[in-house]
């Protein structure tokens, strides 16, 4: 029997506000435990929440960027459950009346563009954090994170493979980063994803029983966890078993999911409107004000890069996947007006450098201005492309302009045709057998001759001049 996967994602994005959603405590990451707290986020009797307007602005930006309809009237609700990191005994969230609904994203798949629906976006507060002692039966509670603002983005169950889910998730991540409302750090938990996965016989309309997968802290782990769960459920159904509705945790080391608890339904949380918060009313003027603040988003920028710079699809996708990378590329093109040459270096040498060091482009030791200066040296014939790679490596630790590095290390290209011609003649005189073989039809020996000349000049001879003079002499 052939099975089809049905996947929906719930994404929690921690918003980059300086203060929490319902109080003035700092949201800064990494502070000493329980130092960014107050009576409101600790749930002390008599303390009252006050909504942070910046949180609403940020939620509206995400709603507009994902084609959602913003509700003119929404309301906060209490989600009731007990856990040690939830001091009030409930979480303030939104339930029946979220801030935004009915959006979508268009994602790239192997079959072309696919529309993934977004059911809703709602605002809520984060819970605290538990750490467990590995040597003693002790758990510690840090409530610094309690009350940190989140938006939850709930997709429709429109994805059919781990790769579609990953593509959707990466696009959401990019949009949040472009909007500058979330730093997207999955390891620190500011961008978290839960996956609802079920399987059904291909062609069947009715959904199967779903399992919710948690604890996936990278795009790769999201793919692996969903792939495992699809395989687990398919095997179970094929063998006559029954899928249980439950929450499962992903174990990246063992490459499997395992049962955590039975999956709760909405009624288990006893949602009801929060009596301490008035309903949120949003008028058209506010929506248009926020719309005017939206930047160029990833898909729009990618389309512009394809048209304006004539880039290949894969290159445009890579360059626009992060706002900082796209900014770096355009800053370089602004100075050195050869978009494809800049693209080759950014997607090649620069990307390799960033990967090797495990850093982002904002931390690159080579600025866009210095890279543009290096490319200008190649264009002006001061150095060859091969020497440029050596200079690029030097620029990782040397903060000077590339021109100064080239001069100090004596890397200026030999372009004098008379000087190169004498070297060409020396090489040909020293290799009579190879010359005869070349003239006898072994044209691949041209690479051998070029290599010999480059060896004599330590790679500094102008390759175009070398090739031209060699052809003239060998084809006589």
From Swiss-Prot:
Q: Where are the transmembrane segments?
A: none
- For this protein, the Enzyme Commission number is 6.3.5.-
Catalytic activity reads: L-glutamyl-tRNA(Gln) + L-glutamine + ATP + H2O = L-glutaminyl-tRNA(Gln) + L-glutamate + ADP + phosphate + H(+); L-aspartyl-tRNA(Asn) + L-glutamine + ATP + H2O = L-asparaginyl-tRNA(Asn) + L-glutamate + ADP + phosphate + 2 H(+)
Q: Which domain of life is it from?
A: Bacteria
**Does the UniProt entry include the keyword rRNA-binding?**
no
The record ties this protein, via InterPro entries, to: Asn/Gln-tRNA_amidoTrfase_suB/E, Asn/Gln-tRNA_Trfase_suB/E_cat, Asn/Gln_amidotransferase, Asn/Gln_tRNA_amidoTrase-B-like, GatB, GatB_C_1, GatB_Yqey_C_2, Gln-tRNA_amidoTrfase_suB_CS
Enumerate the SMART domains for this protein.
GatB_Yqey
Q: What is one process in the GO biological process aspect for this record?
A: glutaminyl-tRNAGln biosynthesis via transamidation
Keywords from UniProt, A to Z, are: ATP-binding, Ligase, Nucleotide-binding, Protein biosynthesis
- Give one GO term, molecular function aspect: glutaminyl-tRNA synthase (glutamine-hydrolyzing) activity
What is known about its subunit structure?
Heterotrimer of A, B and C subunits.
- Function summary: Allows the formation of correctly charged Asn-tRNA(Asn) or Gln-tRNA(Gln) through the transamidation of misacylated Asp-tRNA(Asn) or Glu-tRNA(Gln) in organisms which lack either or both of asparaginyl-tRNA or glutaminyl-tRNA synthetases. The reaction takes place in the presence of glutamine and ATP through an activated phospho-Asp-tRNA(Asn) or phospho-Glu-tRNA(Gln).
Family as reported in the entry's similarity comment: Belongs to the GatB/GatE family. GatB subfamily.
Q: Which NCBIfam families match?
A: gatB, PRK05477.1-2, PRK05477.1-4, PRK05477.1-5
Protein name per its UniProtKB record: Aspartyl/glutamyl-tRNA(Asn/Gln) amidotransferase subunit B
Which organism's genome codes for this protein? Answer: Desulfatibacillum aliphaticivorans
The upper taxonomy is:
Bacteria, Pseudomonadati, Thermodesulfobacteriota, Desulfobacteria, Desulfobacterales
What gene is behind this protein? gatB
């Amino acid at each position: 029997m052939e099975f089809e996967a049905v996947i929906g994602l719930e994404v929690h994005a921690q918003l980059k506000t300086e203060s929490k959603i319902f109080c003035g405590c700092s949201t800064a990451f990494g502070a000493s435990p329980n130092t960014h707290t107050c009576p409101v986020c600790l749930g002390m009797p008599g303390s009252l929440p006050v909504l942070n307007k910046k949180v609403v602005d940020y939620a509206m930006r995400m709603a507009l960027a994902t084609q959602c309809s913003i509700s003119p009237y929404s309301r906060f609700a209490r989600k009731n459950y007990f856990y040690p990191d939830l001091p009030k005994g409930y979480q303030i969230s939104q339930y029946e009346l979220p801030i935004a609904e009915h959006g979508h994203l268009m994602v790239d798949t192997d079959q072309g563009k696919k529309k993934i629906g977004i059911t809703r976006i709602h605002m809520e507060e984060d819970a605290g954090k538990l750490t467990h002692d590995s040597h003693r039966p002790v758990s510690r509670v840090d409530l610094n994170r309690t009350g940190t603002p989140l938006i939850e983005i709930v997709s429709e169950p429109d994805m059919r493979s781990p790769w579609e889910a990953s593509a959707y998730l990466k696009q959401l991540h990019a949009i949040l980063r472009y909007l500058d409302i979330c730093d997207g750090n999955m390891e620190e938990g500011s961008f978290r994803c839960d996956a609802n996965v079920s399987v059904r016989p291909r062609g069947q309309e009715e959904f199967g029983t779903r399992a919710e997968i948690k604890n996936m802290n990278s795009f790769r782990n999201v793919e692996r966890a969903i792939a495992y769960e699809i395989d687990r459920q398919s095997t179970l159904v094929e063998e006559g078993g029954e899928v249980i509705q439950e929450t499962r945790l992903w174990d990246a080391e063992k490459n499997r999911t395992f049962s955590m608890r039975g999956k709760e339904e909405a009624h288990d949380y006893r949602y009801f409107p929060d009596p301490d918060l008035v309903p949120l009313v949003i008028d058209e003027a506010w929506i248009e004000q926020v719309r005017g603040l939206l930047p160029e988003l990833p898909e729009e920028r990618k389309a512009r890069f394809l048209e304006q710079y004539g880039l290949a699809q894969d290159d445009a996708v890579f360059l626009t996947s992060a706002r900082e990378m796209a900014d770096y590329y355009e800053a370089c093109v602004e100075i050195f007006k050869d978009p494809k040459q800049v693209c080759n270096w950014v997607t090649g040498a620069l990307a390799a450098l960033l990967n090797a060091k495990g850093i982002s482009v904002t931390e690159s030791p080579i600025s866009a201005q210095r890279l543009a200066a290096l490319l200008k040296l190649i264009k002006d014939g001061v150095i060859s492309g091969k020497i440029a790679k050596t200079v690029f490596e030097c620029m990782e630790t040397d903060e000077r302009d590339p021109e100064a590095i080239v001069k100090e290390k004596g890397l200026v290209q030999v372009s004098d045709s008379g000087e190169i011609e004498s070297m060409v003649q020396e090489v040909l005189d020293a290799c009579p057998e190879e010359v005869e073989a070349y003239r006898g039809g072994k044209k691949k020996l041209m690479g051998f001759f070029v290599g010999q000349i480059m060896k004599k000049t330590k790679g500094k001879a102008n390759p175009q001049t070398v090739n031209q003079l060699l052809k003239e002499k060998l084809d006589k």
